[in-house]
């Protein structure tokens, strides 16, 4: 059974490319249903999601609902794949959002944007073009965050194996460090304590990495969708209700702080006589920039914070599992030779 990664594009840039090409086709006068069909038959854009959506919309199914149905199916199959693979679905759900999760959020965002454009009477092509630009900015921010995290994550994985290296080093020197660990009382104490410290270090590292990984998969999306709604001529109240419905239908996460800021943007627009759509898109860009900067700051902080489990857990475990058995073996051989 294929994993969910094969069912949706592998990067946000690919999702953005699909959205941008849809915008170009629609701007050229191609009907929405035909646009999806053309993309599904294009070798450069073939993927399971586009193909599945194209097949369903040909029968007259609502496009936004079709995208959401496809995402629900992919998520359900992914859950089944995870259970069949190793039964660790629960731990994966608690982990930080993966690239596949970010891509799924992008597709759900597309469904929400499509729904808002249709309901608000906004032209689909400009709305999708703006959304594709938002996805590319989001992809860039996510790449920057993951790049900043790569160093600390590699460090966290590397330091955990240091105690094992210590044990192998003792064996290479000709000492029975393994026998000392499992066959003597002091060795067993060192073994149990060292393993507990290693387990604590691994849990600690994973929690810190998870806390430093961006969790908002679609920052600024609420402002993007409101910009689409008001650009179609919808009133402020109508735009808010339409976007709220779109979020509820699509399952996208709503940032409560962003919802509060929306009123300030509309108030500024009315007082200054500036188009609300322009201000909303500007606010969405600002939120994405801040999210990217925050992710980079967390990654930089993580590089320092990882020294805590290294000093408090890994190094003591290294002493208990690598150095202490070696010393015990030396003492044992020395005493035995007297």
Model-derived regions, located:
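Juxtamembrane/interface alpha-helical elements of multi-pass membrane proteins
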Residues: 1-75, 79-95, 190-253, 259-268, ...
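Conserved G/P- and acidic residue-centered "switch" motifs that form tight phosphate/ATP-binding loops
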Residues: 29, 121, 273
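Membrane-interface, cytosolic juxtamembrane amphipathic helix immediately N-terminal to a transmembrane helix
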Residues: 83-105, 112-160, 277-313
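Short cytosolic helices in intracellular loops of multi-pass membrane proteins
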Residues: 108-112, 222-225
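Membrane-spanning helices that line or support transport/gating and their immediate boundary helices
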Residues: 130, 203, 207, 211, ...
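Bilayer-spanning, highly hydrophobic alpha-helical transmembrane segments
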Residues: 144-202, 296-338
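C-terminal soluble domains/tails of integral membrane proteins
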Residues: 238-296, 301, 308, 314-332, ...
